[in-house]
Amino acid sequence: MTRNFAKQILLIAAFFLIATASEAQYQWNSDSAYRAGAENTGRIWGYVFGDFYYKSKADSLNRGGNNQYTGIPKNRNAFAFRRLYLGYDFNFNKSFSSELLLAAEDNFPAGNPPSTATTGASGDLTSNGKETFFIKLANVRWKNIVKGTDLVVGEQVTPSFAALTEKVWNYRSVERTISDILRTPSYDMGAGLNGKYAKGNFGYNLLVANGSSDKPASTSFKWFYGDVWAMFLDKHLIVDVYADYQRLNWQTGYHHDRQMLKGFVAYSSSPITVGVEGFVNNIRADTKATKIGGGSDTIATKANGVAFFVHGDIVTNKLRFFARVDLYNPNSKVDNSKYTAYSGISSPNGYMTPGYKMTFSPSTGAAATATSTGDPTSKNTFFTAGLDFMPFKDIHFEPNVWYEHYASQLTSTGKQADADVVWRMTFFFVFGKHYSNTYTQL
C-alpha cells in the first residue's frame, strides 16, 4: 500500500513537472498574450446568448421564412438558447495563427415551416431533437504574406457582414443584420485575403469559397466575395461597400445566378452609434411569374432591403439603449398588371419563401401541418428596441421587443397584413476574451 501511495505521489509530481515545463514554453490560455501576438500563445473563449420569450401575436399566414419566430403559435413562451460559441485561437509565431470555433445555434429554428412534428425540426439539431455543436471556423492565417495583407485558408469569416457591419451594429444577441437574416453566409470554406493599410483606416477583404458555409460542397460553383472599407474622423465614421457573385445553375437554356451589392455607413462612438445598411440582390431566372391571360414567364428576383439602427449610453458602462428598423422587399419585379402569381424556381435559401397556413396539436402545441399559401411577395417591416443592462463587464441582460409586419404585394389576395410580436428578456455573456469597450459584444 505504501508502495502504491509512493507511485501516485511520483505520478502527480511528474504531471506537475511536465505542466510547469510546458507552461514555460507555451501560454495555452492567455487573452492578453494572444492579443499581443506573442509566439506560442493561445486562448480559450466563448459566448452565449438566449432568451425567455413570450409571443403575444402571431402572423396568421406564418410568413418570414427563416425568421426566429415564424411558425411559433400565439401565446407560446419558452426559455431558449440562440447561440453557444466555444473557440480556441492560437499564435504559432508572429507570422502564423489559427482559429477553431464550435457553434450551436438556431440557424434554422425548429418549428419554421414547412417543418412540422411529422417532418422533423429544420434547425441545427440531432435526429433526436437535441441541439449540438458543429465546426463553424477552422483556418490558418499567414500574416503579412504581402505587406499589409494576410492570407487565410480554411473555414473563415466572409467579407459580407461579420467582420465589420455586425460589429458596429453590436447587438447580434438581439438580431442578425438584415443581410444575415436573408442568409448571406457569414462563414465559408475557401481562401481569402484581408488587407489593412494607413494605420487601419483603409482595408479590403476578398474570398473565394464553396458557398455552402460548413457543409461539404455539392457543386463546382464558387461564391466570390469582396468588400472595401474606410474609416474617417479618427475612425468614428465608417464606410463599407460589399459585393458578391455565385452561379446557382448553369446549363444550356438556363443561366441562374445571384449577385448582391451592399453599402454601409455608420458613425460610431462610445456615447452613441448610428448606422444604415442597404442591399440589392439580383437573382437571375429565379421566379416563375404566372400571366393573367395564361402561361408564364421566367423572370429575375430583385430583392432589396435597408436597415437603420442606433444604440448608445444611458449610464456609462451600466445601462444602454438600442433600436432598429428594417424594410425589406423580396421582389421589386412584382407587376400586378401583367402577372397573377409568383413562385421561386430554385431560389437560394432565404429568398422567395411563401407563407404557410399551419395547424397545431391541441395537446402539445407542436406544429401538425403546414400548407403553403404560394405567395412569396410579402414585404416585411422589422422593428426592435430595448435596454442593455450590464451588472458586470461581459455580462448583459437585455429586455426587448421583437416585431415583424408582413403585407402581400398581390392585388388578387389583398395585402393580408399581419404581424409577429415577441417580448423577450435576452441574456448574453462572454468569457476568455475581453473587449476595449464594456458594451461591445462582438
Say what each PLM segment does.
Residues 27-29, 37, 55-60, 69-73, ...:
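Outer-membrane beta-barrel pore domains
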Residues 9-19:
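Bacterial N-terminal signal peptides
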Residues 7, 80, 184, 378-379:
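Short hydrophobic/aromatic segments of transmembrane alpha-helices and their interfaces
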Residues 1-10:
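Bacterial N-terminal signal peptides that target proteins for export
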Residues 20-24:
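Sec/Tat signal peptide C-region and signal peptidase I cleavage site
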Residues 218-221, 255-256:
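Short glycine/proline-enriched turns and hinge-like loops at secondary-structure junctions
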Residues 31-57, 73-213, 220-239, 311-331:
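Outer membrane beta-barrel
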